Amino acid sequence: MAALYPALTPEQKKELAEIAQRIVSNGKGILAADESTGTMGKRLSAIKVENVDENRRVYRQLLFSSDPSVTKAIGGVIFYEETLYQKTDDGTPFVKLIKDRGIVVGIKVDKGTVPLAGTDGESTTQGLDGLAERCARYKKDGADFAKWRCVLKISKNTPSALAIAENANVLARYASICQQNGLVPIVEPEILPDGDHDLKTCQYVTEKVLAATYKALSDHHVYLEGSLLKPNMVTAGQASKIRCSPQEVAMATVTALRRTVPSAVPGITFLSGGQSEEDASLNLNAINQLPLERPWALSFSYGRALQASVLKAWAGAPANIPAAKKEFEKRAAINGLAAQGKYVPAGSSGSAASESLFIANHNY
């Protein structure tokens, strides 16, 4: 066996561990506001708003300038590169606005998925070229964590062993590069909800993917205490005729995590995966009420499940901004409670919160 060459200094490890803990402490989670320009275009066109720089800036300003009470539930915000350099109406950089509230700034660093040759329509994620230089710049410009998404799907022939191994290795390379540059890596091996598979199949595949991911992270000497995991919840496929209860989703999800994720990882921040806002909150709540030992913080890193109602309330009108902020504050508070297993639904959650947010072969 090769000699052990320490990759990170004790000071680097301490900083990374402290950042990771801050993001997920006391029921806090992450607002994923890292939609690419193309994805924001789809979101804005749904409310008949033009996809231009200023409209994207105004919308993100709406989210970032909500009532300070959201800091009880939001520990981190993931930016898209464009957002990292945008400012509020009065000239305050978004990065300063967020950091002044005690929220950690993150940045999406991958360059999207590309086809993986020799597979049945599977993909890998690009963006490793120049990543070290970009991470160093983002750290200097105020970011303290990063996100990289890999995508796998369940079908008769997928995920293949090749796709699992390739994506695990890419995630590990990314995580190692981030840590060398002072950024906490969020590792996101998303298994898409597309398909008619049952809960048991999703659990099996999730376990295989996470086991491969953590083997790769070990091979690449990634410091787990200074990292976070962003997995899918274990659910039946979107086209499955069987609808699972939050308790069934919780048991399958936590069982898969207990079998594969080392307890050194400080936090697991679930993606919403096209669930409705309310389903994402109910499932997270059930996960945190499960009578099984859970050595990690189990929280959220939601994009659509924190923003769908906000977008509808805003609809691009300046007069609607206060109402839209209220919607965001409400969803943030609900998920902050769910991350502690303390969410008690109060009857009807409103039509927008109950709408499925599923998008086939979702890409952003």
From Swiss-Prot:
SUPFAM superfamilies named in the record: Aldolase
Enzyme class: lyase
EC identifiers of the protein: 4.1.2.13
Site (Necessary for preference for fructose 1,6-bisphosphate over fructose 1-phosphate): 364
Tissue: Expressed mainly in the liver and also in brain and other tissues, except for the heart muscle.
GO biological process, one term: glycolytic process
PROSITE patterns linked: ALDOLASE_CLASS_I
One Pfam family matching this protein: Glycolytic
Catalyzed reactions: beta-D-fructose 1,6-bisphosphate = D-glyceraldehyde 3-phosphate + dihydroxyacetone phosphate
Family (UniProt): Belongs to the class I fructose-bisphosphate aldolase family.
Oligomer status and interactors: Homotetramer.
Protein name: Fructose-bisphosphate aldolase, non-muscle type
